[in-house]
């Protein structure tokens, strides 16, 4: 394995430890990492934001840069956001979906328009409490079956489509 290939593997490994500040999930499992390039001790990471106006973008960038700069052999770490293609639920890994569900956050399989399921009891007998949850990427619901409130991840592309 070349030094560049070894560093690339280390970079991917360290990215798996960087968590989103608003969600209990690594940015790799959330599907934020679009590309990683390594050359001569320089690392360049391109991220896809879940929401364009997400207030956590600067925090995520700082966390990624800090983690990368701590790696031996990294002289320079550049992190930028790309808006070439929108983030979608398809980018999230099964492990990421499971972590969010374990945290009590429902995640639609593919579209926000799917019926919501309570992460506590699995019931679909739920009601939307507010489309505007504690962060721009979550909505709040209440389960009629177990009476637990819960949050549901909402993909931005689906919300925009539902308003047309």
Residue ranges of model-derived segments:
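Domain-level signature for proteins that mediate thiol-based redox and metal-cofactor handling
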Residues: 1-164
């Amino acid at each position: 394995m070349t030094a560049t290939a070894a560093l690339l593997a280390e970079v991917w490994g360290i990215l798996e430890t960087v968590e989103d500040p608003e969600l209990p999930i690594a940015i790799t499992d959330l599907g934020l990492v679009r590309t990683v390039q390594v050359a001569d001790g320089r690392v360049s990471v391109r991220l896809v934001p879940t929401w364009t106006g997400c207030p956590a973008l600067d925090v995520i960038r700082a966390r990624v840069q800090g983690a990368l700069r701590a790696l031996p052999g990294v002289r320079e770490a550049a992190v930028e956001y790309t808006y070439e293609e929108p983030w979608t639920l398809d980018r999230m890994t099964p492990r990421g979906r499971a972590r969010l569900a374990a945290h009590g956050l429902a995640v639609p399989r593919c579209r926000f328009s799917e019926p919501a399921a309570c992460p506590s009891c699995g019931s679909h007998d739920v009601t939307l409490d507010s489309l505007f949850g504690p962060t721009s990427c979550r909505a709040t619901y209440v389960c009629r079956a177990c009476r637990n409130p819960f949050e549901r991840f909402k993909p931005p592309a689906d919300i925009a489509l539902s308003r047309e």
